């Protein structure tokens, strides 16, 4: 993106402030400033912004089988995240591949691999902020079409598909930001809900992803004030979806707490909005941390570590025992050239989850080697699995009766 284009973007934003609401003014200025500072990084992605994406309309008028969230979650086995893909934060359709080590566009052949590998849940993280095109928070139609196309890949495979808002830097749970955030949450989710209101119960909406005080000292621990504000955000999400018509009145929705944290104080602060029996708790838990997520941590799994059993005991105490289902929306262990230890950890994790009928969704970011967060399972280019032993473990637990889990 050249300097003239950057200048034009900022000038257009300033001129548009004349007719914007105060909340919209703040959001657009923040977005334009962020976009300008990352213009060089995003220039390649910008080139494809106006491409037309063909969209199947085969699921726009499905018959909804009305079921409780508890019964729906009981039908789930294991899940897989299409990570670092639609959640990347560049602009245009090219954003889909901007974070990937190999620029492989998502295709149906990838999603076709999931059922045979023991997965019947597909989570599609999507970032919407850089695809908003005006002061009314309108989402780029081409981006929405592409999201729908990928959703259809999952639905066509009989998968349960989780669709969310992901790396949204515009929500910040502070009193000064709350009203503007709620305005945008309602606007974004009204559009998503309208586009997908004809889909059946296999499509699940997840309102927020790891909402937190970004860049602040309490970013990952939270504050009581921020936790309360996030409850208000979730309430706005639920009310917006329920008011959108179609099948959305009976759709199961996922609710999270501060940062989607597995810390007890953050989980216990979750207040479910008034609704029917169609709400699911979402939590992220890469455990044990030093083994699973810390790039400088150990490559040895300690089966005596209590982090995994304590997580599920807490989830049972706070939610499962009260009839509220839970999905671990993100988990996994980084590749440290330690497949045997990773298999042992995965076995213990899935066994602990199965006791409480909690499906777990692996974070696959298509990264396998190097010093970063390497959670990749699927070789998207060659349509193979990098770690067959891990996949065999998923397949085993997909067939396991939760009541028999040890």
UniProtKB/Swiss-Prot annotation:
The Gene Ontology biological process annotation of the record reads: cellulose catabolic process
Q: Which SUPFAM superfamilies match?
A: (Trans)glycosidases
Q: Where is the active site?
A: 210, 330
**For bias kind Polar residues, which ranges apply?**
30-41, 51-62
| InterPro entries associated with the record | Glyco_hydro_5 (IPR001547), Glyco_hydro_5_CS (IPR018087), Glycoside_hydrolase_SF (IPR017853), Glycosyl_hydrolase_5 (IPR050386)
Q: Catalyses which reaction? A: Endohydrolysis of (1->4)-beta-D-glucosidic linkages in cellulose, lichenin and cereal beta-D-glucans
Uppermost EC category: hydrolase
Q: Which GO terms describe its molecular function?
A: beta-glucosidase activity; cellulase activity
Swiss-Prot/TrEMBL keywords: Carbohydrate metabolism, Cellulose degradation, Glycosidase, Hydrolase, Polysaccharide degradation, Signal
Top-level division of the source organism's lineage: Bacteria
Task: Note the SS bond partners.
Answer: none
**Name used for this protein in its record:** Endoglucanase 1
Which species is this UniProt entry from? Answer: Ruminococcus albus
Q: What lineage does the source organism belong to?
A: Bacteria, Bacillati, Bacillota, Clostridia, Eubacteriales
């Amino acid at each position: 993106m050249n300097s003239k284009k950057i200048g034009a973007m900022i000038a257009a934003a300033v001129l548009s402030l004349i007719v914007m609401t105060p909340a919209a003014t703040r959001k657009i200025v923040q977005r334009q400033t962020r976009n300008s500072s990352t213009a060089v990084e995003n220039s390649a992605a910008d080139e494809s912004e106006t491409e037309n994406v063909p969209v199947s309309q085969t699921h726009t008028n499905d018959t909804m089988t009305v079921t409780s969230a508890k019964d729906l979650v009981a039908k789930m086995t294991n899940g897989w995240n299409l990570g670092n893909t639609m959640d990347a934060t560049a602009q245009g359709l090219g954003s889909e591949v901007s974070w990937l080590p190999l620029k492989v566009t998502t295709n149906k052949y990838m999603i076709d691999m999931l059922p045979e590998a023991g997965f019947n849940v597909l989570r599609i993280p999507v970032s919407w902020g850089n695809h908003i095109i005006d002061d009314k928070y309108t989402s780029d139609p081409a981006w929405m079409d592409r999201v729908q196309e990928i959703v259809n890949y999952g639905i066509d495979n009989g998968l349960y598909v989780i669709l969310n808002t992901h790396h949204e830097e515009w929500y910040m749970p502070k009193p000064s930001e709350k009203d503007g955030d709620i305005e945008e949450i309602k606007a974004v989710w009204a559009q998503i809900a309208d586009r997908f209101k004809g889909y059946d119960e296999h499509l699940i909406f997840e309102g927020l992803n790891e909402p937190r005080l970004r860049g602040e000292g309490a970013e990952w621990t939270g504050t009581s004030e921020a936790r309360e504000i996030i409850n208000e955000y979730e309430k706005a999400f639920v009310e917006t979806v329920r008011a959108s018509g179609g099948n959305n009145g009976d759709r199961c929705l996922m609710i999270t707490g501060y940062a989607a944290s597995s810390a007890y104080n953050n989980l216990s602060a979750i207040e479910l909005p008034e609704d029917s029996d169609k709400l699911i708790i979402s939590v992220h838990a890469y455990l044990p941390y030093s083994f699973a997520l810390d790039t400088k941590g150990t490559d040895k799994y300690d089966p005596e570590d209590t982090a995994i059993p304590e997580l599920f005991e807490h989830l049972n105490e706070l939610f499962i025992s009260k009839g509220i289902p839970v999905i671990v929306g993100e988990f996994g262990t980084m590749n440290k050239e330690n497949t045997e230890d990773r298999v042992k950890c995965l076995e213990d994790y899935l066994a602990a989850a199965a006791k409480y009928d909690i499906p777990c969704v692996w974070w696959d970011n298509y990264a396998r080697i190097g010093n970063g967060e390497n959670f990749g399972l699927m070789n998207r280019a060659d349509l193979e699995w990098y770690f067959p032993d891990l996949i065999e473990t998923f397949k085993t637990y997909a067939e396991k009766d939760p009541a028999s889990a040890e």
